[in-house]
């Protein structure tokens, strides 16, 4: 896979549309399979299930009031919040498996993240926490602590996009945002499931995790050791 580092932190909606552009390009064979690593802007990413809830408009206003940009994502369930203290990992693959390869791609991403974080001195546990935000079987959490990584997929006929959001720092601020957004959406939430890696590992940083992700990708042969920037 090629490595892509392009990001639009000042315009989160562009990051969302850029991901869709890359997925379509991979599906059409216009570019090779790739991994995109970037630090996003202040974002609340709503799922399509959120849009059908009566409190959706209020939740968007709440996000804006907290200085976040609301966007609608194509993958995942319910709302997630992240900012420049988070790291987004996107893996674009071309294949004809469709939904048949769904679980294996989730496992592949979770395994990569656990290996990379372990190399950075951080232990992550696979599994959904009771009452977590944007719940999922392949969430990763700190031992006895909060969820710090969510994983989602978008699947086309000829390609897939597996996305992970790792909250490295700034857990307290995001906890406030998510609690307010979920209250507006009238969704259940155990607030203590919201946090960041630095809650237990204060020495962790986005740059450290980014580098260990690249190192792990190169070591297992899935990632080319050169960066490719997209306009």
Regions found by a protein language model. Give the residues of each.
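Beta-rich nucleic-acid/ligand-interaction surfaces
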Residues: 126-147
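Contiguous, small/hydrophobic- and glycine-enriched helical/loop subdomains that border
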Residues: 84-131
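Short acidic-glycine loop/turn motifs at beta-strand connectors
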Residues: 40, 142-145, 156-157, 170
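Short, conserved charged micro-motifs
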Residues: 54-57, 98-102, 172-177, 205-206
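Short, solvent-exposed loop/turn elements at beta->coil junctions and helix N-caps
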Residues: 75-79, 127-131, 154
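Generic non-transmembrane alpha-helical segments
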Residues: 25, 58-62, 66, 112-120, ...
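Long, positively charged amphipathic alpha-helical accessory segments at protein N-termini or as interdomain linkers
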Residues: 120-122, 151-154, 158-231
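N-terminal lobe of the biotin/lipoate ligase/transferase fold
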Residues: 1-100
């Amino acid at each position: 896979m090629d490595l892509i580092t392009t990001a639009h932190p000042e315009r989160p909606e562009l990051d969302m549309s850029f991901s869709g552009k890359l997925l379509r390009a991979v599906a059409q064979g216009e570019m090779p399979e790739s991994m995109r690593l970037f630090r996003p802007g202040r974002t609340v990413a709503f799922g399509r299930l959120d849009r059908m809830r009566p409190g959706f408009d209020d939740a968007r206003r709440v996000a804006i009031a907290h200085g976040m940009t609301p966007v609608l994502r194509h993958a995942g369930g319910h709302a997630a919040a992240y900012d420049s203290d988070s790291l987004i990992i996107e893996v674009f693959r071309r294949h004809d498996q469709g939904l048949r390869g769904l679980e294996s791609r989730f496992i592949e991403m979770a395994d990569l993240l656990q290996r990379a974080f372990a190399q950075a001195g951080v232990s992550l546990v696979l599994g959904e926490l009771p009452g977590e935000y944007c719940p999922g079987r392949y969430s990763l959490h700190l031992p006895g602590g909060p969820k710090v990584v969510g994983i989602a997929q978008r699947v086309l006929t000829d390609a897939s996009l597996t996305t992970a959001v790792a909250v490295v720092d700034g857990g307290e601020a995001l906890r406030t945002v998510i609690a307010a957004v979920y209250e507006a959406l009238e969704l259940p939430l155990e607030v203590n499931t919201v946090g960041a890696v630095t809650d237990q590992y204060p020495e962790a940083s986005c740059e450290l995790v980014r580098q260990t992700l690249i190192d792990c990708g190169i070591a297992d042969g899935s990632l080319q050791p050169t960066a490719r920037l997209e306009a």
